[in-house]
Amino acid sequence: MKKILSLILAVMMLAVVPAFAVDADLSFGTQETGTAGYTYATAIQTVIQKVDGINVTLLTNSAGNVSAPVLIQEEEADLTMSNSAPAMWAANGGIESASVPECPDIRCIAGGLGHDFVNVMFTQKFVDETGIKTVEELVEKKYPIKLVIKKNGTLGELAAEKVFGVLGVTFDDIISWGGVVEKTGGAQIKDGLQDDLYQMTVDHIGAGQANTTDLCINHAMYDVQLSDDTLAKLCEEGFDYVTVEPNTWNGQTEEIKTVGSQQCVLVSANLDEEVAYQITKAMCENKDVLAEASAALGYFDPTVAGSKALTGCELHPGAARYYEEMGYAFK
């Protein structure tokens, strides 16, 4: 009888063990303390660790979202954050201008973490003097524009490269027209435009970005609307449509239709499928916790987080399984 009771007890104990029991000690590669990236990573770490058996340690070994896929490819972190467009470029040949090699082993857990966008501006003085109001017209006329953008390897610099690239123009072409392409820091960009040393800038930023906010308050700027055809071509390059609401910047009275590349969480293709499933589930079922940590994370929408436009690279099978079970969009 004792043997029978012991057997029954053992079976009952096995029955209450969750089918999804996991045991994983993961590292999350992020940027240094005090950055927005670190804030996002901390919030995601918090919700992932709600899963029994998963522990996440933050490593401040990421140089930024453009090069972040390398951390996964070279097994320097189990998770990291990138943006959908750089993730796509890294997975499909690498990013030469940012010295990012091809990263075929990266997979996405979830995308759409943010509301950043490609921001194109002329100085109002430039528009008044030339009558040029669009990038397409500038390119058609081969105008020797004085362009100032972020440094090599930043998403701002790559966004500028793509805006001109889909119009068939390189930075070398602009220089050959007699123009200038200056790559520098954010504060220097703001000061240079305010002093009318430059006439145009392109960046990838979010509403409220300090330098652009200050620039538009202290200097008359013109918000440039890209054509529908240009926007469609940029979407083919890994971006997705974003609307910039009126009054995002001082003097901007109308909405601007543009594109952006939102942040995404990357893991290795070799990550255990059940672990990836549980990470995805934890993020999606705790989206309110993420939103409380950062306004940018409030844009996270689980119903589309697995869609191609937001993931950049291939979804991890564990993540795809969760989205499919929930009836959410996934590729």
Model-based region annotation:
Residues 4-21:
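Sec-dependent N-terminal signal peptides of Gram-positive bacterial secreted proteins and lipoproteins
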Residues 23, 53, 63-64, 74, ...:
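Extracytoplasmic
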Residues 25-51, 56-59, 116-195, 308-318:
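Bilobed "Venus flytrap"/periplasmic-binding protein-like clamshell domains
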Residues 33-36, 64, 85-89, 116, ...:
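Solvent-exposed loop/turn segments at secondary-structure junctions
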Residues 40, 205-208, 214-217, 223, ...:
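An extracytoplasmic/periplasmic, membrane-proximal ligand-sensing/linker region
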Residues 84-86, 94-96, 102-104, 108-110, ...:
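Pocket-lining segment of extracytoplasmic ligand-binding domains
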Residues 131-159, 240-308:
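Ligand-binding clefts/hinges and TM-proximal coupling segments of bilobed small-molecule sensing domains
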